Amino acid sequence: MREALNQGLIDFLKASPTPFHATAALAQRLEAAGYQRLDERETWTTEPNGRYYVTRNDSSIIAFKLGRHSPLQGGIRLVGAHTDSPCLRVKPQPELQRQGFWQLGVEVYGGALLAPWFDRDLSLAGRVTFRRDGKVESQLIDFKLPIAIIPNLAIHLNREANQGWAINAQTELPPILAQFAGDERVDFRAVLTDQLAREHGLNADVVLDYELSFYDTQSAAVIGLNGDFIAGARLDNLLSCYAGLQALLTSETDETCVLVCNDHEEVGSCSACGADGPMLEQTLRRLLPEGDEFVRTIQKSLLVSADNAHGVHPNYAEKHDANHGPKLNAGPVIKVNSNQRYATNSETAGFFRHLCMAQEVPVQSFVVRSDMGCGSTIGPITASHLGVRTVDIGLPTFAMHSIRELCGSHDLAHLVKVLGAFYASHDLP
């Protein structure tokens, strides 16, 4: 089971270079399992034991299976994650022609570790909006091949490179795509038009706009002398999206279960499809009775907010509280913060720990050092919007927000097992 899950994750990561592609990959797997797509613009007709999903902006997705029991009776079991990861996104007018090279101007999305982006074989993917036969359409594209690179400056020309060199995102991050001769002009939108034709057989009249991100073409892999680790891009937080999906598809329950994977977590979640937007609440209100019964159902429900945790790094152990250093391959981490950067409380943490113990899954705790700031997740945002009880958890990870992150190869199976038990649980606290 562990090897199959890990390979499934690797395949999912490869299919998901952007939030758009991740949402499409999740939808494809849901439909293969019998889930029916619902359109937010249409009237919904749902049935007990039905399986459905809905997307917004092509980058956020909510999947749910309705239980045999009324949600008012037993509440809803929700798992939340996010589809986006820090990256380099192409600017609207990106063409740069300098010293005989064609480059694209980029904007840093989220809190990316920038140094690892140098000297990597990069490709480009995302969503393109275009006009065809007088109509405006959108389509996902993925060049797949390594078409760009950001070469480092040789140390001979930058003797401070190993001494805390600050990276200027405006001047040092534009990737190189090609060389050009003389006064030749390169039209990026014409390149996108050609890609639409090659990849989808679409003859676009004009490319109107796009949302495109560079990504590392190196595939994720199980690595280490004993295969102890998984290295790959976008583990934060596609790892949790995939774990939630597998738990939803394999759990057997009479209760209503929901998986929500929001976009824009890395930039604050404040969007129509982010956790700080109305998507989840609007979806639940279409499934549940209004007024008093809606509030009662939410108060009987529980959300597991799943987002990667910081594993204790052997070279930087002092960055962790000495008593709260999560280890790779030692199970999921319950994340706690007294200032509500995480939404965990004693009741929700206790219930998650109870689930882990019942499934013989190891479990750990994390709290940030008292002299350091703490990150956050969709947990507190969703809890404040819905009023739903929440526990923040995640799998220990190294190099979070790097172009290539690292997690334990045993931990995915741990997380899928406990999330499956959560979905199947008959009684919530």
From Swiss-Prot:
Gene Ontology terms: cellular component: cytoplasm
EC number: 3.4.11.-
Record flagged with keyword Membrane: no
InterPro entries: M18_aminopeptidase_2 (IPR022984), Peptidase_M18 (IPR001948), Peptidase_M18_dom2 (IPR023358)
Keyword match Transmembrane: no
UniProt keyword terms in alphabetical order: Aminopeptidase, Hydrolase, Metal-binding, Metalloprotease, Protease, Zinc
Binding site for Zn(2+): H82, H156, H401
Any one GO biological process: proteolysis
Class in the EC hierarchy, top level: hydrolase
Cofactor(s) recorded in Swiss-Prot or TrEMBL: Zn(2+)
Molecular function per GO: aminopeptidase activity; metallopeptidase activity; zinc ion binding
Domain of life: Bacteria
PANTHER family referenced in this protein's UniProt entry, alphabetically: ASPARTYL AMINOPEPTIDASE
Family to which the UniProt record says this protein belongs: Belongs to the peptidase M18 family.
Identification of the protein by name: Probable M18 family aminopeptidase 2
